Amino acid sequence: ILSIKCKCKIYFIKVDDILYLEVLKNDLTIHTEKGIYTFKSSMKEIESNLEEHNFFRCHKSYLINLMKVNMLDIENNIVFINQNSIIVSRYKIKLLREKLNSCLVDVII
């Protein structure tokens, strides 16, 4: 469970419910199956906590949950999660494919 302090509230978000995170300027947005949470933070602060939970930084602005990926468009460097298209850095596409293959093998076994 990830705890996020936003103004006067603290949200408790199940890591498994997180689809992806995106950052724009100083606003970090967490997209989940149940809603969207936006607050002031940097991606680095949260990234280290989520890497061990099959999350991957595919672009400077995006951190994705590998277990939620529906499709990878290698030609256009785009990953799809629940109808959302997310840009993948061309420098990270190969590593993303490896990570996805690793996750899929872990799930199948």
Kindly give the residue locations of the regions a language model identified:
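Conserved binding/recognition cores within well-folded domains
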Residues: 1-81
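Eukaryotic intrinsically disordered, low-complexity regulatory linkers and tails enriched in Ser/Thr/Pro
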Residues: 1-8, 90-109
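Short, conserved aromatic-histidine micro-motifs
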Residues: 82-87
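Intrinsically disordered, low-complexity sequence elements enriched in Ser/Thr/Gly/Pro
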Residues: 38, 55, 88-90, 95
